[in-house]
Amino acid sequence: MSFASQARDEIAQRSLQLQKDCCVRAAAYGIACFAKYFDARGLVLQTEQELTARVAEQLFARCGVQGTVLEKPRPSGVVYEFGIREPEQVRRMHELFGTTGSETSLQIDPGLIRCQTCVSAYISTAFLCGGTVTDPQKEYNLEFLTGRTNLAKDFEALLAEHEFAPHRTRRNGVNLIYVKSSASVERILAFMGAAEASAQMNAQKAVKQLRNQINRQTNCDTANLGKTARANAQTTRAIRFLQEQGALETLPEVLQQAAAMRMENPDLSLTALCACFEPPVSKSGLSHRMKKLEALAEDLRRRLEENAEKEETK
Protein backbone atom coordinates (compact mmCIF):
# COMPACT_ATOMS: atom_id res chain seq x y z
CA MET A 1 0.00 0.00 0.00
CA SER A 2 1.32 3.44 -0.94
CA PHE A 3 1.91 6.09 1.70
CA ALA A 4 -0.97 8.19 0.31
CA SER A 5 -3.34 5.19 0.41
CA GLN A 6 -2.35 4.40 3.98
CA ALA A 7 -3.02 7.99 5.05
CA ARG A 8 -6.32 8.06 3.15
CA ASP A 9 -7.52 4.82 4.76
CA GLU A 10 -6.68 6.06 8.26
CA ILE A 11 -8.51 9.33 7.64
CA ALA A 12 -11.53 7.54 6.19
CA GLN A 13 -11.81 5.19 9.17
CA ARG A 14 -11.50 8.07 11.60
CA SER A 15 -14.20 10.02 9.72
CA LEU A 16 -16.60 7.10 10.20
CA GLN A 17 -15.98 7.16 13.97
CA LEU A 18 -17.09 10.76 14.55
CA GLN A 19 -19.50 11.00 17.49
CA LYS A 20 -20.99 14.50 17.70
CA ASP A 21 -23.69 15.53 15.24
CA CYS A 22 -21.96 18.85 14.51
CA CYS A 23 -18.75 17.02 13.57
CA VAL A 24 -20.57 14.56 11.29
CA ARG A 25 -22.24 17.51 9.57
CA ALA A 26 -18.88 19.29 9.21
CA ALA A 27 -17.43 16.16 7.60
CA ALA A 28 -20.37 15.98 5.18
CA TYR A 29 -19.90 19.69 4.46
CA GLY A 30 -16.27 19.06 3.53
CA ILE A 31 -17.45 16.49 0.99
CA ALA A 32 -20.01 18.93 -0.44
CA CYS A 33 -17.46 21.73 -0.79
CA PHE A 34 -14.89 19.57 -2.59
CA ALA A 35 -17.35 17.53 -4.68
CA LYS A 36 -17.54 17.77 -8.47
CA TYR A 37 -20.69 19.81 -8.12
CA PHE A 38 -22.85 21.01 -5.24
CA ASP A 39 -25.79 23.14 -6.36
CA ALA A 40 -29.53 23.09 -7.07
CA ARG A 41 -29.15 19.85 -9.02
CA GLY A 42 -27.80 18.10 -5.94
CA LEU A 43 -24.32 16.76 -5.30
CA VAL A 44 -21.90 14.53 -7.22
CA LEU A 45 -18.54 13.32 -5.98
CA GLN A 46 -16.31 11.29 -8.30
CA THR A 47 -13.35 9.39 -6.89
CA GLU A 48 -11.07 6.47 -7.73
CA GLN A 49 -11.35 5.32 -4.11
CA GLU A 50 -14.42 3.22 -3.30
CA LEU A 51 -13.84 3.80 0.42
CA THR A 52 -14.13 7.57 -0.07
CA ALA A 53 -17.47 7.17 -1.85
CA ARG A 54 -18.74 4.86 0.92
CA VAL A 55 -17.60 7.30 3.61
CA ALA A 56 -19.56 10.07 1.86
CA GLU A 57 -22.63 7.84 1.66
CA GLN A 58 -22.50 6.95 5.36
CA LEU A 59 -21.80 10.47 6.60
CA PHE A 60 -24.72 11.95 4.69
CA ALA A 61 -26.95 9.07 5.82
CA ARG A 62 -26.12 9.93 9.44
CA CYS A 63 -27.26 13.48 8.66
CA GLY A 64 -30.57 12.18 7.28
CA VAL A 65 -29.67 12.59 3.61
CA GLN A 66 -29.70 9.52 1.35
CA GLY A 67 -27.36 9.22 -1.62
CA THR A 68 -26.21 6.43 -3.93
CA VAL A 69 -22.83 5.07 -5.00
CA LEU A 70 -22.36 4.01 -8.62
CA GLU A 71 -19.43 2.30 -10.32
CA LYS A 72 -18.52 3.82 -13.67
CA PRO A 73 -15.97 1.95 -15.82
CA ARG A 74 -13.46 4.23 -17.53
CA PRO A 75 -10.44 3.45 -19.76
CA SER A 76 -8.17 4.36 -16.85
CA GLY A 77 -10.13 2.24 -14.36
CA VAL A 78 -13.32 2.29 -12.32
CA VAL A 79 -14.59 5.63 -11.00
CA TYR A 80 -16.89 5.60 -7.99
CA GLU A 81 -19.59 8.24 -8.01
CA PHE A 82 -21.50 9.28 -4.93
CA GLY A 83 -24.57 11.28 -5.84
CA ILE A 84 -27.53 13.03 -4.23
CA ARG A 85 -30.03 13.70 -7.02
CA GLU A 86 -33.50 12.78 -5.75
CA PRO A 87 -35.35 16.11 -5.21
CA GLU A 88 -36.39 15.42 -1.62
CA GLN A 89 -32.83 14.41 -0.66
CA VAL A 90 -31.43 17.48 -2.42
CA ARG A 91 -33.84 19.64 -0.40
CA ARG A 92 -32.71 17.97 2.85
CA MET A 93 -29.06 18.46 1.94
CA HIS A 94 -29.47 22.19 1.36
CA GLU A 95 -31.53 22.47 4.53
CA LEU A 96 -28.70 20.71 6.41
CA PHE A 97 -26.12 23.24 5.22
CA GLY A 98 -28.34 26.31 5.07
CA THR A 99 -27.78 26.67 1.33
CA THR A 100 -30.16 27.06 -1.60
CA GLY A 101 -28.10 25.67 -4.44
CA SER A 102 -28.31 28.94 -6.32
CA GLU A 103 -25.24 30.51 -4.69
CA THR A 104 -22.95 32.12 -7.28
CA SER A 105 -19.85 31.48 -5.17
CA LEU A 106 -19.14 28.76 -2.64
CA GLN A 107 -17.37 29.90 0.51
CA ILE A 108 -16.84 28.17 3.84
CA ASP A 109 -19.65 28.88 6.31
CA PRO A 110 -17.96 29.12 9.75
CA GLY A 111 -21.31 28.36 11.39
CA LEU A 112 -21.00 24.79 10.10
CA ILE A 113 -17.59 24.31 11.74
CA ARG A 114 -18.29 24.81 15.42
CA CYS A 115 -15.55 23.01 17.37
CA GLN A 116 -11.97 21.84 16.91
CA THR A 117 -13.12 18.35 15.96
CA CYS A 118 -15.41 19.94 13.36
CA VAL A 119 -12.36 21.64 11.84
CA SER A 120 -10.50 18.34 11.76
CA ALA A 121 -13.52 16.54 10.26
CA TYR A 122 -13.98 19.18 7.56
CA ILE A 123 -10.30 19.19 6.54
CA SER A 124 -10.24 15.38 6.61
CA THR A 125 -13.08 14.90 4.12
CA ALA A 126 -11.72 17.73 1.98
CA PHE A 127 -8.53 15.68 1.77
CA LEU A 128 -10.43 12.48 0.92
CA CYS A 129 -12.23 14.27 -1.93
CA GLY A 130 -9.56 16.56 -3.31
CA GLY A 131 -6.27 15.91 -1.57
CA THR A 132 -3.11 13.88 -1.86
CA VAL A 133 0.19 13.46 -0.03
CA THR A 134 3.57 12.59 -1.52
CA ASP A 135 5.66 9.70 -0.18
CA PRO A 136 8.05 11.40 2.29
CA GLN A 137 10.91 9.29 0.94
CA LYS A 138 10.65 11.45 -2.20
CA GLU A 139 9.61 14.86 -0.88
CA TYR A 140 7.38 16.58 1.67
CA ASN A 141 4.16 17.75 0.07
CA LEU A 142 0.46 17.59 0.95
CA GLU A 143 -2.10 19.34 -1.24
CA PHE A 144 -5.79 20.03 -1.80
CA LEU A 145 -7.31 20.82 -5.21
CA THR A 146 -10.53 22.65 -6.03
CA GLY A 147 -11.94 24.51 -8.99
CA ARG A 148 -13.65 27.01 -6.66
CA THR A 149 -11.45 30.08 -6.16
CA ASN A 150 -13.24 31.65 -3.18
CA LEU A 151 -13.39 28.27 -1.47
CA ALA A 152 -9.63 27.90 -2.02
CA LYS A 153 -9.01 31.28 -0.38
CA ASP A 154 -11.18 30.40 2.62
CA PHE A 155 -9.57 26.97 2.92
CA GLU A 156 -6.08 28.47 2.86
CA ALA A 157 -7.14 30.86 5.63
CA LEU A 158 -8.55 27.96 7.67
CA LEU A 159 -5.26 26.05 7.43
CA ALA A 160 -3.28 29.19 8.23
CA GLU A 161 -5.46 29.84 11.29
CA HIS A 162 -4.33 26.46 12.61
CA GLU A 163 -0.66 27.19 11.76
CA PHE A 164 -0.22 24.60 9.01
CA ALA A 165 1.74 27.13 6.89
CA PRO A 166 -0.28 26.68 3.66
CA HIS A 167 0.42 28.17 0.24
CA ARG A 168 -1.98 28.72 -2.64
CA THR A 169 -1.45 28.76 -6.40
CA ARG A 170 -3.14 27.71 -9.65
CA ARG A 171 -2.15 24.75 -11.79
CA ASN A 172 -3.82 24.02 -15.12
CA GLY A 173 -6.75 26.23 -14.16
CA VAL A 174 -7.28 24.51 -10.79
CA ASN A 175 -6.71 26.06 -7.36
CA LEU A 176 -4.02 24.29 -5.37
CA ILE A 177 -3.57 24.71 -1.61
CA TYR A 178 -0.42 22.95 -0.45
CA VAL A 179 1.82 22.38 2.57
CA LYS A 180 5.55 21.77 2.02
CA SER A 181 7.17 21.91 5.46
CA SER A 182 7.84 18.42 6.83
CA ALA A 183 6.72 19.47 10.31
CA SER A 184 3.47 20.94 8.95
CA VAL A 185 2.75 17.86 6.82
CA GLU A 186 3.28 15.64 9.88
CA ARG A 187 0.99 17.82 12.00
CA ILE A 188 -1.82 18.03 9.48
CA LEU A 189 -1.75 14.25 8.92
CA ALA A 190 -2.07 13.68 12.66
CA PHE A 191 -4.77 16.38 12.88
CA MET A 192 -6.82 14.57 10.21
CA GLY A 193 -6.49 11.26 12.05
CA ALA A 194 -3.64 9.64 10.11
CA ALA A 195 -1.52 9.09 13.21
CA GLU A 196 0.35 6.07 11.84
CA ALA A 197 1.18 7.83 8.57
CA SER A 198 2.40 10.84 10.55
CA ALA A 199 4.57 8.61 12.77
CA GLN A 200 5.92 6.78 9.72
CA MET A 201 6.81 10.08 8.13
CA ASN A 202 8.61 11.18 11.28
CA ALA A 203 10.58 7.91 11.34
CA GLN A 204 11.50 8.22 7.66
CA LYS A 205 12.60 11.80 8.24
CA ALA A 206 14.88 10.64 11.06
CA VAL A 207 16.38 7.97 8.78
CA LYS A 208 16.87 10.53 6.00
CA GLN A 209 18.57 12.95 8.40
CA LEU A 210 20.85 10.16 9.65
CA ARG A 211 21.76 9.20 6.08
CA ASN A 212 22.51 12.80 5.22
CA GLN A 213 24.66 13.11 8.32
CA ILE A 214 26.54 9.93 7.40
CA ASN A 215 27.00 11.13 3.82
CA ARG A 216 28.32 14.48 5.01
CA GLN A 217 30.73 12.74 7.38
CA THR A 218 31.81 10.32 4.65
CA ASN A 219 32.41 13.18 2.23
CA CYS A 220 34.34 15.03 4.91
CA ASP A 221 36.40 11.93 5.72
CA THR A 222 37.07 11.34 2.02
CA ALA A 223 38.20 14.93 1.59
CA ASN A 224 40.43 14.64 4.65
CA LEU A 225 41.92 11.38 3.35
CA GLY A 226 42.69 13.05 0.04
CA LYS A 227 44.26 16.00 1.81
CA THR A 228 46.32 13.66 4.03
CA ALA A 229 47.46 11.59 1.06
CA ARG A 230 48.61 14.68 -0.85
CA ALA A 231 50.47 16.05 2.17
CA ASN A 232 52.12 12.69 2.86
CA ALA A 233 53.18 12.34 -0.78
CA GLN A 234 54.73 15.81 -0.76
CA THR A 235 56.71 15.06 2.41
CA THR A 236 57.80 11.64 1.13
CA ARG A 237 59.10 13.15 -2.14
CA ALA A 238 61.09 15.72 -0.15
CA ILE A 239 62.65 13.05 2.09
CA ARG A 240 63.51 10.84 -0.87
CA PHE A 241 65.19 13.77 -2.62
CA LEU A 242 67.26 14.53 0.48
CA GLN A 243 68.29 10.86 0.64
CA GLU A 244 69.30 10.81 -3.03
CA GLN A 245 71.46 13.90 -2.57
CA GLY A 246 73.12 12.46 0.56
CA ALA A 247 71.82 15.38 2.61
CA LEU A 248 69.52 13.51 4.98
CA GLU A 249 72.30 12.09 7.16
CA THR A 250 73.69 15.61 7.69
CA LEU A 251 70.49 16.82 9.34
CA PRO A 252 69.78 16.97 13.09
CA GLU A 253 68.73 13.66 14.67
CA VAL A 254 65.14 14.79 15.31
CA LEU A 255 64.69 15.49 11.59
CA GLN A 256 66.29 12.18 10.59
CA GLN A 257 64.00 10.38 13.04
CA ALA A 258 60.92 12.15 11.67
CA ALA A 259 61.98 11.32 8.09
CA ALA A 260 62.55 7.65 8.92
CA MET A 261 59.17 7.36 10.67
CA ARG A 262 57.37 8.93 7.70
CA MET A 263 59.08 6.64 5.17
CA GLU A 264 58.15 3.60 7.29
CA ASN A 265 54.52 4.76 7.52
CA PRO A 266 53.74 6.66 4.30
CA ASP A 267 49.93 6.34 4.62
CA LEU A 268 49.42 7.34 8.26
CA SER A 269 47.88 10.68 9.10
CA LEU A 270 50.01 13.12 11.06
CA THR A 271 47.97 12.42 14.20
CA ALA A 272 48.47 8.65 13.89
CA LEU A 273 52.17 9.10 13.11
CA CYS A 274 52.66 11.07 16.35
CA ALA A 275 51.68 7.98 18.34
CA CYS A 276 54.44 5.93 16.68
CA PHE A 277 57.15 7.90 18.47
CA GLU A 278 58.48 6.88 21.88
CA PRO A 279 57.58 8.97 23.71
CA PRO A 280 54.78 10.33 21.47
CA VAL A 281 55.34 13.78 20.00
CA SER A 282 52.82 16.57 19.58
CA LYS A 283 51.06 17.05 16.27
CA SER A 284 52.28 20.64 16.00
CA GLY A 285 55.85 19.57 16.73
CA LEU A 286 55.81 16.79 14.13
CA SER A 287 54.13 19.06 11.59
CA HIS A 288 56.94 21.58 12.08
CA ARG A 289 59.57 18.89 11.43
CA MET A 290 57.85 17.70 8.25
CA LYS A 291 57.60 21.25 6.93
CA LYS A 292 61.28 21.76 7.80
CA LEU A 293 62.20 18.68 5.74
CA GLU A 294 60.16 19.97 2.81
CA ALA A 295 61.76 23.42 3.07
CA LEU A 296 65.27 21.94 3.20
CA ALA A 297 64.56 19.79 0.15
CA GLU A 298 63.18 22.77 -1.74
CA ASP A 299 66.17 24.91 -0.78
CA LEU A 300 68.60 22.17 -1.86
CA ARG A 301 66.78 21.70 -5.17
CA ARG A 302 66.90 25.45 -5.84
CA ARG A 303 70.65 25.65 -5.11
CA LEU A 304 71.37 22.67 -7.34
CA GLU A 305 69.42 24.27 -10.18
CA GLU A 306 71.29 27.57 -9.73
CA ASN A 307 74.65 25.76 -9.81
CA ALA A 308 73.60 23.90 -12.94
CA GLU A 309 72.70 27.19 -14.65
CA LYS A 310 76.09 28.69 -13.72
CA GLU A 311 77.89 25.69 -15.20
CA GLU A 312 75.97 26.12 -18.44
CA THR A 313 76.99 29.78 -18.78
CA LYS A 314 80.72 29.10 -18.40
Q: What are these model-derived regions, one by one?
A:
Residues R25-F34, A121-C129, A260:
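Short, hydrophobic/amphipathic alpha-helical patches that form generic packing surfaces
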Residues A295-E305:
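Short, Lys/Arg-enriched C-terminal cap helix and immediately downstream tail that follows
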Residues M1-G42, Q46-F60:
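N-terminal, positively charged regions that mediate nucleic acid binding
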Residues T47, R54, Q58-N202:
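DNA-contacting interfaces and partner/effector-binding or oligomerization modules
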Residues L16-R25, L112-V119, E249-E253:
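Structural motif
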Residues V44-E48, E143-T146, C276-V281:
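Short helix-coil junctions and helix-kink-helix linkers
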Residues F191-K291:
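Extended mid-to-C-terminal alpha-helical interaction segments
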Residues M261, L304-K314:
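Gram-positive cell-envelope targeting signals
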